[in-house]
Amino acid sequence: MLEIIEIKQYRKLKDITLNFVKGINIISGSNGTCKSSLLYIISNSFQKITKNSLKNKESVSVISNINKLMNPKIESLTRGDEKYNDPAPNVKGELYKCKYFDNDMKLDFRRHNSGKENKEKKRFSIRPKYKKGNNEKIPAMPVIYLGLFRLFSYGEFLNDKEIKKITKKLPKEYLDIIAKIYKDFTNIEILLDEENDYNGMNMGEIKKRGNFSTTYDGIDSNTISAGEDNLYIILTALVSLRYYFEEENRSSILLIDELDATLHPSYQIRLYKLMKEYSKNYEIQIFFTSHSLSLIEYALEDKEDKKDSKVFYFLENPNVRLMEEISINKIE
């Protein structure tokens, strides 16, 4: 798990130190304050788990098949840039440094340019620099990243040829857990019997989602609302990492960009409570961005296990800085 990030410079993030908790880390701030960029940095600071290091060699394969992005690197998350965008102009060497909870190791991460000198083709990656003579390596841990692609509506996806079933799935006991939690939230009962072919759905390069029928006529995975679809995707990620922990007894990380998008405020609070429970019981370190003042206020006033959650609020003037002694009155 990630304990500290010291950012020298990455885009607008400059000379910032972030001390995280093992539980829930909420990242908020006005538009353009590099909240999503911070999620990219976190994901970039871990490598994929290899099958050879696992008790159940299929555990990571299963969760990577049903979740859209696992352990994405900065170069893949920024590949949509139309031209080369230097993340730290005129800065040489270290861009940021990470310290991890599980050991005293600190890793420096630096820019590596690749491609042609033509700026239309040039790209960058950010990789650790290992000290000579030390047995250092970037920690391996499953990182599920839920970006805004998860909000794309099935009804607006016009290329049926790209839609494919996902044959690998969680064991039935975990599908039952997802279904139970989903019903608790929505009062919609998912059918998981053998007559209903319960497989995930891969919508091309867009997203992976559930594919199911329900006990209500006319309501299934293709007709539920955007918020209900978003909720299902988030629950799938949480239960996937629970499955991983119960199989391997190892920690994991969940990153969610704009958790509150499409979700009713009551869902946001209930999801926050569920994430606190899952984070504590199944060693899932959670980071999410949010613009929801009601959710932020609830988290700030949450007195139960205060050390298990933390709010970061970014201000811009002109570089991003952290609000000190954060309160909802200061934010409003």
Residue spans for each PLM region:
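Conserved hydrophobic alpha-helix in the ABC-type ATPase nucleotide-binding domain
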Residues: 234, 271-272
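P-loop NTPase switch/coupling surface
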Residues: 1-154, 165, 169-170
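Extended helical coiled-coil dimerization/tether regions that scaffold
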Residues: 145-229, 236-245, 249
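Phosphate-binding P-loop
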Residues: 16-22, 245-249, 280
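Loop/turn-to-beta-strand initiation segments
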Residues: 250-252, 283-287
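Walker B catalytic acidic pair
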Residues: 257-259
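RecA-like P-loop NTPase motor core
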Residues: 296-332
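H-loop/switch region of ABC-family ATPase nucleotide-binding domains
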Residues: 289-291
